[in-house]
A protein has these predicted regions:
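Short, well-formed alpha-helical segments that are part of the catalytic scaffolds
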Residues: 1-13
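A conserved acidic beta->alpha catalytic loop
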Residues: 25-35, 53, 80-81
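Glycine-rich, basic loop-to-helix element that forms the pyrophosphate-binding segment
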Residues: 51-68
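Short aromatic/hydrophobic "clamp" motif used to bind/position activated sugar donors
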Residues: 73
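Conserved donor NDP-sugar-binding/catalytic core segment of glycosyltransferases
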Residues: 85-117
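Short, flexible, basic/aromatic active-site loop/helix in glycosyltransferases
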Residues: 105-106, 120-138
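Catalytic donor/gating beta->alpha subdomain of glycosyltransferases that bind UDP-sugars
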Residues: 164, 169-225
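Membrane-embedded multi-pass helical conduit in multi-pass membrane proteins
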Residues: 237-309, 346-355
Length: 355
């Protein structure tokens, strides 16, 4: 619990005509509460709650919803730095759109400063945090800076079984579909979010993202916004593994399997190299490695969730996180898929031509 980050949040300028109540929940029973925070709690300026067990984000957010009674619920991460007029921006939005489902502010990340943060930026890992700058409405958003209308939320809550990831997408899309409307973007409600762990590797985070996405894929309100897709690198390697016995029975040497595996991996690396050069205008092997590592960590998380749950028939399926229309068209292409297909084809031709 970092009082240097929390105190500015707890002392934001309060808009006229609104009652503001802070609820600070710590999901760590062993936390040492700073004296300044404890003092605010003892004076009744905030409500401080400490979970008896480490219960996860869904339980913690649900507890906050239940402990509060305001018409509007603002979720803020505890490590953000808010703009001084954050609450005024939300208050103005409430006055202008009192029947809104909720509002999504902008969560800015600092400029990338190393290979990990550059990889996260290039891979799109932080794009959804600032989507309010470019879209008027959204079906969901990260809960780092997001407000919900309690009356429209009703009795919907975060699913507590989603302990690894996907809980924000699941609830917010369910709430959006249940009300037949989306959350309004609020580009004036800005907070700054530091790079996770001071810019160190986020492989575990990407794994959790993938795992959570595969878990919620099975839910009807999510699945109808998914479609068949070309296999990613991990899925392609798994399919090759399944085919290996038949390849060997056909008399094809095992070295061919190894060669195909190498081509699959090399195509991924070369594609990321081209992405790095095209987008960031630099060709850095460490950056290419971090892009590949973090992207594939998310794919491994997705695959591992399917494998653990016996849902391998959901391989080669992607969620349309824009949630634009149900049953999106399958096998959609983008330039990087086309580039990867082209590179794979060239590598296959070069390999077998040499043979």
């Amino acid at each position: 619990m970092n009082e240097h980050l929390l105190m500015p949040i707890l002392h934001l300028t309060r808009p006229d005509g609104f009652q503001i109540r802070y609820i600070l929940i710590c999901d760590n029973p062993d936390v040492k509460v700073p004296a300044a925070i404890q003092g605010l709690a003892e004076r009744g300026a905030i409500k401080l709650l400490v979970n008896e067990l480490n219960s996860g984000p869904s339980f913690t957010r649900n507890r906050g919803i239940e402990e509060s009674d305001g018409q509007w619920i603002l979720f803020l991460d505890d490590d953000i730095v808010p703009s001084p007029d954050l609450l005024n921006a939300y208050a103005d939005a409430i006055h202008a759109h009192p029947e809104s489902l909720g509002f999504v502010g902008v969560t800015e990340f600092p400029k990338p400063f190393n290979d990990v943060t550059s990889a996260l930026e290039l891979n799109g890992a932080v794009g959804f945090f600032r989507m309010s700058k470019s879209k008027k409405e959204q079906a969901w958003a990260p809960t780092a800076n997001l407000m919900l209308n309690r009356s429209l939320l009703g009795d919907r809550r975060f699913r507590t079984e989603l302990t690894i990831g996907g809980e924000d997408v699941e609830l917010l899309t369910r709430n959006s579909q249940g009300n037949g409307k989306q959350y309004l973007s609020l580009p004036d409600a800005v907070v700054s979010h530091p790079w996770w762990d001071e810019g160190r590797s986020q492989v575990k985070r990407m794994f959790r993202y993938g795992y959570g996405n595969a878990t919620i894929l099975q839910l009807p309100h999510i699945r109808k916004y998914s479609c068949l897709d070309f296999p990613n690198t991990i899925e392609t390697l798994f399919l090759l593994l399944l085919l290996t016995p038949f390849i060997l029975i056909a008399g094809i040497p095992f070295v061919t399997v190894l060669m195909l595996s190498g081509i699959i991996l090399l195509a991924e690396l070369v594609t990321n190299a081209i992405r790095s050069l095209t987008v960031s205008h630099k060709l850095s092997p460490p950056l290419i490695w971090q892009m590949t590592l973090h992207k594939n960590a998310q794919e491994v998380g997705f695959f591992w969730s399917l494998l653990r749950r016996g849902r391998l028939l959901s391989m080669c399926r992607m969620i349309d996180f824009g949630f634009k229309k149900p049953h999106p068209s399958p096998f959609r292409l983008n330039r990087w898929k086309i580039v990867k297909m082209g590179i794979t084809t060239l590598l296959l031709l070069a390999a077998f031509w040499g043979i």
